[in-house]
């Protein structure tokens, strides 16, 4: 068994999708999400250098880590200079879990963060922050990050590298008058699942209320639209929705309550 970690470049870019979308490579909706992410990865490569690392198990791409400077994302409110945002670590292959692929990816990022990252112009970063979530595959990211030495803070986890952790000031949500009697769902090109998920959200909202107007907004291309809504993933009738789509009963109830608000 041999594990190799490689930085993303134009030659291995498609391996990102062989990891993250390996079950949906021919799905038309997923391919649209892949197209958006492919363009974003190339844009980031050109402007910053590699923001993804891939783990290969005996030559096969099996896991990836996505990271980027926090101030490179236009819709992030009050970004912290010199801070690396760890978006995700993903290993979808059961036969490749428990072999250290994810750990090697994180260790590689930590090592370069202290010595100098290409996407920071060769400078070390101050600290790494992460927003863990649970894909339902393998161990939850929060648990994995804790095992790797990350600490918990309000709304994120962090690992100090060359400086002490500082929380980010976040804008509180302010209802937007133009969002009355309609829904706004945000998506971005950072993950190829984001756009397909936004389409699922729109479909679910139309099932709940066929008369509801639903607009999908690309946060990357329209950062101010995302910022003024506090980057909430879904707004219905000027009300942020907190229930997750997969919790159908809670989601439907919260959406209906928001629609009925005067």
Describe each PLM feature range.
Residues 1-57, 190-193, 197-203:
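Short amphipathic alpha-helix that is part of the acyltransferase structural core
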Residues 52-54, 60-71, 85:
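Conserved beta-strand in the GNAT
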Residues 76-97:
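Conserved acetyl-CoA binding element of GNAT-fold acetyltransferases
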Residues 91, 97-114:
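Conserved acetyl-CoA-binding loop-helix of GNAT-fold acetyltransferases
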Residues 113-137:
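Conserved GNAT acetyl-CoA-binding A-motif
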Residues 153-182:
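C-terminal "cap" of GNAT-fold acetyltransferases
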Residues 172-207:
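Local sequence-structure signature of Cys/Sec-based thiol-disulfide redox active-site neighborhoods
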Residues 238-262:
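Non-catalytic, surface beta->alpha helical segment in thiol-disulfide oxidoreductase systems
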């Amino acid at each position: 068994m041999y594990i190799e970690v490689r930085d993303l470049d134009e030659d291995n870019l498609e391996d990102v999708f062989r990891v993250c979308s390996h079950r949906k490579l021919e799905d038309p909706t997923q391919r649209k999400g892949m197209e958006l992410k492919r363009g974003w990865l190339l844009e980031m490569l050109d402007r910053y250098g590699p923001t993804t690392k891939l783990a290969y198990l005996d030559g096969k791409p099996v896991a990836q880590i996505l990271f980027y400077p926090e101030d490179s994302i236009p819709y992030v409110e009050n970004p912290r200079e010199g801070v690396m945002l760890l978006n995700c670590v993903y290993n979808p292959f059961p036969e490749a879990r428990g072999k250290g692929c994810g750990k090697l990816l994180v260790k590689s990022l930590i090592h370069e963060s202290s010595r100098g990252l290409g996407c920071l112009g060769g400078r070390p970063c101050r600290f790494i922050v992460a927003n863990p979530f649970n894909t339902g595959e393998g161990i939850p990211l929060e648990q994995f990050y804790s095992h790797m030495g990350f600490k918990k803070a309000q709304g994120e986890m962090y690992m100090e590298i060359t400086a002490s952790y500082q929380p980010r000031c976040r804008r509180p949500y302010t209802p937007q008058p133009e969002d009355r009697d309609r829904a706004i769902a945000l998506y971005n090109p950072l993950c190829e699942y984001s756009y397909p998920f936004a389409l699922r959200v729109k479909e679910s909202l139309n099932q709940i209320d066929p008369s509801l107007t639903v607009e999908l907004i690309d946060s990357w291309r329209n950062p101010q639209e995302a910022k003024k809504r506090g980057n909430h993933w879904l707004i219905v009738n000027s009300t942020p929705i907190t229930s997750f789509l997969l919790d159908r009963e809670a989601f439907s109830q919260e959406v209906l309550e928001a629609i009925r608000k005067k």
